Amino acid sequence: MASSVISSAAVATRSNVTQASMVAPFTGLKSSATFPVTKKQNLDITSIASNGGRVSCMQVWPPINMKKYETLSYLPDLSDEQLLSEIEYLLKNGWVPCLEFETEHGFVYRENNKSPGYYDGRYWTMWKLPMFGCTDATQVLAEVQEAKKAYPQAWVRIIGFDNVRQVQCISFIAYKPEGY
C-alpha cells in the first residue's frame, strides 16, 4: 500500500509540472461587435499605410551596359592587394585555385535555346591545370597576369575548388577587358 501511495504522488507531481508548462488552447476569434467602430473618412493614400518613415529607398541595378558577372560583381574591380587577400582566403580554406577565361561573353547568355544548357555562358575555358598543392597566393596572381597578357580581351576568373567534396566553393572575376 505504501508503494502505491508513493507512486501516485510521483505521478501527480509529474502531471502538475506538465500542466504548468502547457499553453491554453486557442478559443477562436473574438467578435468585432463588442468593439466600438470608428471610421476615418480620409481618402489620402499616404494615411492608409505607414512604416514610420524607417525605409530608405534603394535604386534598382541599371541593366543597360552594366552586366553582372559573378557574386559581388557590382563592386569596383579588385586591386592586386584585394586579389591577394581573396586568394589567401581561398588557400586558407584548403581549396584548390583554378583560373578560367572567356574570350567572347563574360556573362551568362542564351544563344541557342531559351532553356539553360551547356553553351549559355556558364562554362569557361580552363587556364592551364588546377593549381593542386599551391600554397602561395602570389603564384596564383602571377598566373592571372600571364593570362591577361595572353588574352587581353578576355575575362579571367579565379575559382576555388574543394577536391574532397568535389564542388566549386568560390568564384570571382580577377580581370575584365577594357570597357566592361
UniProtKB/Swiss-Prot annotation:
It comes from the Eukaryota. Pfam families: RbcS, RuBisCO_small. Residues 1-56 form a transit peptide. Keywords: Antiviral defense, Calvin cycle, Carbon dioxide fixation, Cell junction, Chloroplast, Host-virus interaction, Photorespiration, Photosynthesis, Plastid, Transit peptide. The keyword Manganese does not apply. It is found in: Plastid, Chloroplast; Cell junction, Plasmodesma. InterPro entries: RuBisCO_ssu, RuBisCO_ssu_dom, RuBisCO_ssu_N, RuBisCO_ssu_sf. GO terms for biological process: defense response to virus; photorespiration; reductive pentose-phosphate cycle. One of its GO terms (molecular function) is ribulose-bisphosphate carboxylase activity. GO terms for cellular component: chloroplast; plasmodesma. The basic functional RuBisCO is composed of a large chain homodimer in a 'head-to-tail' conformation. In form I RuBisCO this homodimer is arranged in a barrel-like tetramer with the small subunits forming a tetrameric 'cap' on each end of the 'barrel'. Belongs to the RuBisCO small chain family. RuBisCO catalyzes two reactions: the carboxylation of D-ribulose 1,5-bisphosphate, the primary event in carbon dioxide fixation, as well as the oxidative fragmentation of the pentose substrate. Both reactions occur simultaneously and in competition at the same active site. Although the small subunit is not catalytic it is essential for maximal activity. Involved in antiviral defenses. Heterohexadecamer of 8 large and 8 small subunits. (Microbial infection) Binds to tobamovirus movement protein; this interaction seems required for viral systemic movement. This is Ribulose bisphosphate carboxylase small subunit, chloroplastic 2.
